[in-house]
């Protein structure tokens, strides 16, 4: 059986978890405590870079969440989660890569806000929100009259972008200017796979508090 080594609070793991659920696959979840378990020799033997997720399939270990999503799509093609049309495939990939290369690196200053911690550098927060708004506009423009990126059905773009964008509301980043993206987010949040994998805000706060001992949740 497929085995997913994950951490409930890791968005990179959650992409894979959601995809396994959306594909209706049987799998075992193995939780890795990122307070050190990832540095143990048994885990490093699977992933020398000490990151979750890792997918194990009959002794074969795959690291890097996007490589895992591609593996699942190739091995379990139904339901299809990557468009076949060239433009639509490019759209799904662009959304994955823009999330990883543009959105995620820009939101660091927003994390404390998302988790309800006070403070933060107002200039850095404003800069982060400006970068985020460029990504949101890009995504809204890329969505056409279909509900998902390049598709009538959920694609591998959704577990990547759709596990980041809903959290932005917690940092007062509104999607009201982006009606297509807002409808897209709402439809994802209603899916059982999103609901089953949502990390608890309290657990995230507790984890963040151990890393930022000088701050208390507001
Ligand atoms: N590029 C990797 C990133 C994985 C990653 O950064 N995982 C984090 C959790 S979100 C992790 O395992 N951190 C613990 C560590 O690096 O020791 C992927 O997409 O799978």
Report the location of each language-model feature.
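Generic structural signal for helix capping and beta-alpha/helix-loop junctions
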Residues: 37-39, 185, 205-206
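Acidic/histidine-enriched, glycine/proline-rich intrinsically disordered or flexible terminal extensions
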Residues: 200-218
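GST-like fold's C-terminal all-alpha helical module
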Residues: 99-192
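Catalytic cores of transferase enzymes with a strong primary signal for eukaryotic protein kinases
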Residues: 23, 160, 174-176, 193, ...
